[in-house]
Amino acid sequence: MFYFKTVRKMERIILHCDLNNFFASAALTKNVTLKGLPLAVCGDTKKRHGIVLAKNEAAKAYGIQTAETVWSAKAKCPELITILPDFELYESLSAAARVIYSQYSEKVECFGIDECWVDLSDPAMNFKRAVQVANDIRRRMKRELRLTVSCGVSFSKYFAKLGSDLKKPDATTCISRENYKSLVWPLPCEALLMVGRKTKQALNGLGIFTVGDLANAPKEALSTRLGVNGVKLKNAANGADGESVTDYKNRPLPKSVSSSATAERDLTTPAEVYAALIGFAEKVAVQLRQYGLLAGSVGVTVVSPAFEGAELTAPLPELTNNSAILAKHAFALFKNGYSQSTPVRAIGLRAANLSPESLVQRQLSLFGEPVETERLQKIEDSMLKIREKYGEQAIMRAACLNSAAKAFSPGFFKG
């Protein structure tokens, strides 16, 4: 006699964690006396970055919005406390949060500095236990990092993300196959990830105003109006996106790597521009090495004091992740494509046409260029080793010691 055992298909269970008011909350971890007071993280008005980057719940109560000017925010709330951003603190807390997430799953996918998806899918896992995991994470965040986090639990990445948005701060929302139609479908279509202003307008033009409308809309109409993304959104509205959580270590490789900044005063000489490009090139080169990539082209973006912009791009003679080579060709682009008599307000460098270093066979030349490339690479390797051992400021390029160093925030030329 034969016996057949029914094997239950493993349900996908995905957690989305969103650190509440992250920039503003991070500041409270260093100064608890600010708790409960209206607080906004803002750019420095003296350095031409005077907008609100983030705010806490107390500031939100005054109607203060992200990206509005500090002057406007102060008009709404004269007692508003403004502080400068502390990106080293944000990166440190974000990394600490990922450590906590990784103790519950090997699959943790970052979505910006303050959000992560965590794949809890396992034959022994169910939604009740997943909610317990989410609540445990919330408790640990408060105890270990002094941060609050909102969690969404669902069978879909889109719904998990939406769940973390439904209740804030410090809450857990479960969107299951049994309740998603009552919880999600009445919401406006823009509540769904990937529905921005233009997509919302396109959907509204089709008579689609809620997630439920989108879920039940004809696939043909969506495909005609929005192409493949229209069908993708319909699937997402039905919880059928099927997108997996990408392990952070196995994240997709970027198509380009860039670094840019607005100077605290206009750059007026070629030497200052070159120093800035060296600073950007070193940051970009470090990222390229971390990804194991080589760049096939370099680009420069320049903005004048009159906010007139220029974007310049050119292929590189050979694939590289060397900062000196990137800066050299970026500077040549700048000299050939931008008026030398026009000051520079903002500038950036971008490396594109990227290829995995492990798959690339560098072609050799008989005319001496590989010797120079090898020399520059040895210099860069030595600089990185010195910085790793003695700190970022232990060694700098001479070009970065001129007056351009005063045109950017402290620490800009640290590689």
Where are these regions (language model features)?
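Short, hydrophobic beta-strand segments
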Residues: 117-122, 311-316, 364-368
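Short Gly/Ser/Thr- and Asp/Glu-enriched loop/turn motifs at secondary-structure junctions
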Residues: 111-115, 154-157, 293-297, 342-346
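A generic structural signal for short beta-strands and their flanking turns/coil linkers
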Residues: 35-37, 78, 147, 294-296, ...
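Short, charged/polar surface micro-motifs in flexible loops or helix N-caps
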Residues: 22, 45-48, 305-308, 354-357
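Acidic, metal-coordinating catalytic segment for phosphate/diphosphate chemistry
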Residues: 318-415
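DNA-contacting surface of Y-family translesion DNA polymerases
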Residues: 16, 199-344
